[in-house]
Amino acid sequence: MLRETWLCVILVAFVSHPVWLQKPHKRKTQLKAAGCCEEMRELKAQVANLSSLLGELSRKQESDWVSVVMQVMELESSSKHMESRLSTAESKYSEMNNQIDIMQLQAAQTVTQTSADAIYDCSSLYQKNYRISGVYKLPPDEFLGSPELEVFCDMETSGGGWTIIQRRKSGLVSFYQDWRQYKQGFGSIRGDFWLGNEHIHRLTRQPSRLRVELEDWEGNARYAEYSYFALGNELNSYRLFLGNYSGNVGKDALLYHNNTVFSTKDKDNDNCLDKCAQLRKGGYWYNCCTDSNLNGVYYRLGEHRKHMDGISWYGWHGANYSLKRVEMKIRPEAFKP
């Protein structure tokens, strides 16, 4: 009886759980694993290809960069070589022009000594008994290459014979002009004017003196004189040359500008990173920048103490005081009243 009972239990369990009817899963799992491995191999191959491409691009970029750097270095070397050659050529050219100036000056002095009837400036007119201050016309001089020139002569101050090259008294003429205007001159000969750098250069080929007359807004007058005054030619940017100072205006405010070249708003020749002509609103022999600014802005009474770009002479009233009146005049060193 017991045996028959165990057989019945085993039979029921076998029928309830027909393991023999279930399908195996092992093959499906193996297929999935094989597919994943294939995808991984493809991804690794793509990553390897990308890494190789990036490496090649990086090497090419580095090679191109080295090539560019080498080209830049070659260009810089070539540029420095050209600058050196240009500087040497300019130096030789400047030396030649200085020699020409000296020869022309010597020739001019010879002509002055041998041509008693020649009229070169206001001192020549004075020697011919023209003793009234005012406007005169100097005849053209073919030897010196100078055209007819209208000038204002001071026949009274300190013995007379002065040719006025600059005047500031009314403020009606702007002195914030370009290179061309300062070269040829501008303004009204009876009012405010600049005679012109080219004319001043020609007039000072013979040894000359400079007199600067100043007047402030309180009615005080001062002057400064220089035993020698000359301008170089345009190729030398109208370089300023001054001799010894004398006068009653205090500190010599032109000394700082001696041996400097002329600058204008469109031609920056100063010795400064700043563009002094634009800062000081004039054309002048700016150094870095100035101890005087006789071609600055004309400020009237009430405004004359507020600006640093006015008509100034630092040795008298300082940098912020704009003067009421200025005259610059020249005559030959050899002049005798």
Swiss-Prot record:
Gene3D superfamilies: Gamma Fibrinogen, chain A, domain 1 (3.90.215.10). SUPFAM superfamilies: Fibrinogen C-terminal domain-like. Its main location: secreted. One of its GO terms (biological process) is negative regulation of vasculature development involved in avascular cornea development in camera-type eye. Residues 30-110 form a coiled coil. GO terms for molecular function: identical protein binding. Keywords: Coiled coil, Disulfide bond, Glycoprotein, Secreted, Signal. Disulfide bonds join 122-153, 276-289. Glycans are attached at residues 49, 244, 258, 320. The keyword Signal applies. It is found in: Secreted. Residues 1-21 form the signal peptide. GO terms for cellular component: extracellular region. InterPro entries: FIB_ANG-like (IPR037579), Fibrinogen-like_C (IPR036056), Fibrinogen_a/b/g_C_1 (IPR014716), Fibrinogen_a/b/g_C_dom (IPR002181). Residues 113-334 form the Fibrinogen C-terminal domain. Homotetramer; disulfide-linked. Has a role in the formation and organization of the extracellular matrix. In the eye, it functions as a mediator of dexamethasone-induced matrix deposition in the trabecular meshwork, the tissue responsible for the outflow of the ocular aqueous humor and for the maintenance of intraocular pressure. Is a negative regulator of angiogenesis in the cornea, and plays a major role in maintaining corneal avascularity and transparency. This is Angiopoietin-related protein 7. It comes from Mus musculus (Mouse). The lineage of its organism: Eukaryota, Metazoa, Chordata, Craniata, Vertebrata.
